[in-house]
Regions:
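C-terminal structural segment of proteins
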Residues: 1-197
Length: 197
């Protein structure tokens, strides 16, 4: 076993080449305390609900993704932010969309000689308002029964862009692209349920 927790570059948040780069060793507490644009509110809400404070202080965003649990709290938020992940090895670097990285319950594209080094979020996705809701049997120290992360951009009262992701409802968290396509162009003042059902 190799402890990589002391590698500072894995625990930083920076802007590089049009992406916000979140080091895979960034803890949930780090994320909660980081100054980030408004669209990261859902990720901060998520951070405050991962396990206990002790877990938030040592548990990392990269660990949450590599664990590939269907109930991994960070995945729906990162899917809604259109995240990619950076994998490094002695052979070089590769970047995958998050939705291509997690293949199933506890199953990822991570090779034996790779580590997940960073989560990359395009700055063009850093617009809009967000929210994260988690349903569990109790309020704290709970494994999710269901969760949803949503990012919405409005032009007046018209939905110009929306990203909705759910977790704990299947083996892999998913973006609800069909629902998103139905909602884009609709007014928030109308009965959206009529359009959905």
């Amino acid at each position: 076993i190799l402890d990589i927790s002391a590698i500072k570059s894995l625990r930083t948040v920076s802007i590089e080449n049009g992406f916000r780069r979140i080091g895979s060793g960034t803890t949930w507490s780090d994320l909660e305390n980081e100054e980030l644009p408004t669209c990261y509110e859902m990720l901060k809400e998520c951070s405050s609900q991962v396990g206990s404070r002790q877990i938030q202080n040592v548990g990392t965003i990269g660990g949450n993704l590599c664990n590939a649990s269907p109930a991994a709290d960070g995945v729906p938020c990162l899917l809604s932010l259109d995240a990619s992940i950076e994998l490094i090895s002695i052979n070089g670097k590769r970047i995958l969309k998050l939705e291509d990285f997690i293949k199933g319950s506890r199953n990822t594209e991570l090779k034996k000689n790779e580590i997940l080094s960073a989560i990359l979020i395009p700055q063009k996705a850093e617009r809009g308002r967000t929210s994260f809701v988690k349903l569990g049997a109790r309020k704290y120290l709970v494994i999710s029964i269901a969760m949803v992360a949503c990012k919405i951009n409005l032009d007046g009262d018209i939905i110009s862009d929306i990203a909705i992701s759910i977790g704990s409802c299947s083996a892999v968290a998913k973006r609800l692209r069909e629902l998103e396509n139905i909602l884009i162009g609709k007014s928030t003042n109308s009965d959206l349920t009529a359009d959905i059902y």
